[in-house]
UniProtKB/Swiss-Prot annotation:
One Pfam family linked to the record: Kazal_1
GO MF annotation, one: serine-type endopeptidase inhibitor activity
Site, Reactive bond 3: residue positions: L18, E19
Taxonomy of the source species: Eukaryota, Metazoa, Chordata, Craniata, Vertebrata
Domain commentary: Avian ovomucoid consists of three homologous, tandem Kazal family inhibitory domains.
Name the UniProt record assigns to this protein: Ovomucoid
InterPro entries the record matches: Bifunctional_prot_inhibitor (IPR051597), Kazal_dom (IPR002350), Kazal_dom_sf (IPR036058), Prot_inh_Kazal-m (IPR001239)
Glycan attachment points: N45
PANTHER family for this protein: OVOMUCOID-LIKE-RELATED, SERINE PEPTIDASE INHIBITOR, KAZAL TYPE 2, TANDEM DUPLICATE 1-RELATED
Subcellular location: Secreted
Keywords assigned by UniProt, alphabetized: Disulfide bond, Glycoprotein, Protease inhibitor, Repeat, Secreted, Serine protease inhibitor
Amino acid sequence: FAAVSVDCSEYPKPACTLEYRPLCGSDNKTYANKCNFCNAVVESNGTLTLSHFGKC
């Protein structure tokens, strides 16, 4: 069983696209796309993780 993960090594980015590919974070918040999620991961100092793909 592999853990669900997203590579956030290219982040943070100053601006995200409006692409809608939702991800659910460990904070039980739905992020619109990988960019928004990864920016939040960076802001959380790595405490935020991916719960699953799709809405929470």
